[in-house]
């Protein structure tokens, strides 16, 4: 059954975007201001001032929220997220359902709820649950530290809404107690291996798997922090992040490795390439 949309001008609608270099263009994303809409944030709590963009980290911040860094750098990003937040605040769950429904692009079949931000109250969480229920042909997914809202509706989550508990919040104890599928930020591949977790590089484990997983630290981190040191170590190993430029660089390396005959590679270079490229091959997909 098609959902009839109200006729609204763009300024009255929420703003969604196509996925970035990490996620791919098949994923649509929705965001709110980092920190300001995250009642469960603790270890990643960071906020970019709405007017100036200046970053303020929370007292317990261990790694800076990458979304707050984006807002600090890009005023348009900051403005868009506050636009969405202002439209939603103060509305009933039913009003939010209507607003979200009216704002969803017709072609959007895979939607990430919150590249930035989180479920800021129970009514808002309930609204997304209902939107997912009204759109069985679409897949929705989210990372969240608002586990108390999830717990309140634990038995009412539709199959097409994939929730991932994000470690490092004020309600972490609920993850183990209720066996929520979860995502944990790690500082190295070795740490992920020690925890028995696969690293998700493109969100596919977030929306397609039922198992918990890890996310590799990225973004801009506070100088001198453990997260900053871990990021520096990763870069020394060749990790360049998720930007399109990084994808192109890896893709070109992979193409060169594939085309150059074996006789032109020394044995130790060949062995090193064969060890690293299985981990990086996914990263150039869609570029070459």
Regions found by a protein language model. Give the residues of each.
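Class I S-adenosyl-L-methionine
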Residues: 1-288
């Amino acid at each position: 059954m098609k959902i009839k949309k109200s006729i609204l001008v763009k300024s009255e609608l929420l703003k969604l975007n196509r996925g970035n270099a990490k996620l791919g263009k098949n994923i649509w994303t929705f965001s709110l201001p980092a920190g300001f809409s995250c009642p469960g944030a603790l270890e990643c709590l960071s906020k970019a001032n709405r007017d100036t963009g200046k970053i303020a980290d929370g007292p317990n911040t261990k790694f800076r929220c990458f979304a707050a860094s984006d807002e600090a750098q890009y005023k348009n990003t900051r403005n868009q997220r506050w636009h969405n937040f202002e439209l939603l605040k103060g509305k009933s769950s039913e009003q939010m359902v209507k607003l979200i429904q009216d704002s969803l692009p017709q072609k959007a079949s895979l939607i990430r709820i919150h590249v930035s931000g989180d479920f800021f109250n129970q009514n808002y969480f309930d609204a997304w649950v209902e939107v997912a229920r009204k759109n069985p042909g679409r897949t929705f997914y989210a990372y969240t530290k608002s586990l108390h809202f999830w717990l309140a509706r634990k038995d009412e989550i539709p199959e097409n809404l994939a929730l991932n508990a994000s470690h490092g919040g004020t309600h972490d104890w609920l993850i183990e107690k209720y066996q929520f599928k979860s995502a944990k930020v790690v500082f190295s591949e070795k740490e992920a291996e020690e925890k028995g977790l696969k690293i998700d590089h493109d969100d596919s484990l977030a929306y397609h798997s039922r198992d918990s997983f890890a996310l590799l630290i990225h973004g801009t981190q506070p100088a001198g922090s453990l997260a900053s040191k871990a990021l520096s170590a990763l870069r020394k190993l060749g990790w360049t992040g998720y930007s399109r430029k990084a994808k192109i660089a890896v893709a070109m390396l992979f193409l060169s490795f594939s085309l150059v005959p074996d006789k032109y590679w020394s044995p130790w270079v060949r062995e090193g390439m064969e060890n690293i490229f299985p981990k990086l091959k996914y990263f150039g997909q869609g570029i070459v």
